[in-house]
């Protein structure tokens, strides 16, 4: 009897019409992206169906950022619609070269849903006629200067990547986009409104984008600024973890070391640090583990010391030790634990070892002194001001500083680069907020039931 019933069910199911596939009931006729830099990015789609189209929802994510955003297109339901969703770039800034992956989810009146295949779009500054050079590691864009100018910057960037791999054991994970703006005004028009007028460039580490002002007659600056910011991006990607950043002195010190700034005449970093050492005015590594000073002279000292400490680690402990240190940080270690595992010293011990190597007076470690455990993870940005000469001698002077910039990029210029929180705006994630509300409601209900 059971066998007969099962057979009847199978026969009836075969006789019933098969449910319509979404691809049959909803058809995408056309889709694409239109954009104008610093104004908008508009995603367009044309759809038809057997039933009225009720909903067209765009999902998009900026490569390098963790959140996926959602946008609902507005239209009047019909069996054929043309609609779009616009990202306002006057408010939600993205740097040039940002890569966006996106897809649509279309729903009709019958509840059928179609998800389009994910596509990729690179957001460009369309106001310039870019020349390009590229390989699997880098894409260089410039519009002022001849081929030799572009070749020089591209070769320097590739040498920097080779040096980072040799000296720190780190490889670039994805292609980095480098934009060379031919004037300071053009650069300022390309970056977020919060940038300072002295900014010479920015590195958007999470986006994998560098933007720098290098005119054809200022190639010397470009040959330093490009490696500096490129180092920030590579190191950030290599040590990225959900627990915290690497110490500020290590991050900036690697950028100074890899760019060759320690031996650039207009920086004068070695003479500067020697002068501060003679005056017993060196900063402690504990101080340099977090934010750098806002004062320009002190900021330059911070960059110079950081670069020399990184040089000391590589020369004294070895390249393998530096590679091990970065790997430990990538796993989410605290500052002192990472240093002790890789070098056998904590922050205070490393500080005094380096001071001894330059014949500087040791520091007395305060009783109960501690080093910041680790910095909060951040979307970072570095800033480079325009080149200035740095005086050396008895009274150290500093070049233009790279102060902390609010909410987005990192900057570069022949002055120190500074890190900031927010390498780009995070896209909204409504679902996370709803989950948080649900958790709070659950606990409140539970406590009320228990009479708490």
Segments (PLM) and residue ranges:
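Juxtacatalytic substrate-recognition/specificity segment
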Residues: 129-247, 275, 292, 302, ...
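C-terminal membrane-anchoring or membrane-association module
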Residues: 431-452
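C-terminal soluble interaction/assembly domains
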Residues: 333-336, 418-424, 438, 443
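Solvent-exposed coil/turn segments that connect beta secondary-structure elements
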Residues: 50, 145, 183-184, 261-263
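Bacterial N-terminal signal peptides that target proteins for export
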Residues: 1-6
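Glycan-association/targeting regions that enable binding to alpha-glucans and other polysaccharides
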Residues: 19-131, 136-139, 452
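Ser/Thr-rich, Proline-interspersed low-complexity disordered segments
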Residues: 7-23, 137, 359-421, 429
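Acidic/His/Gly-enriched intrinsically disordered linker/tail segments
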Residues: 197-209, 214, 220-225, 237-381
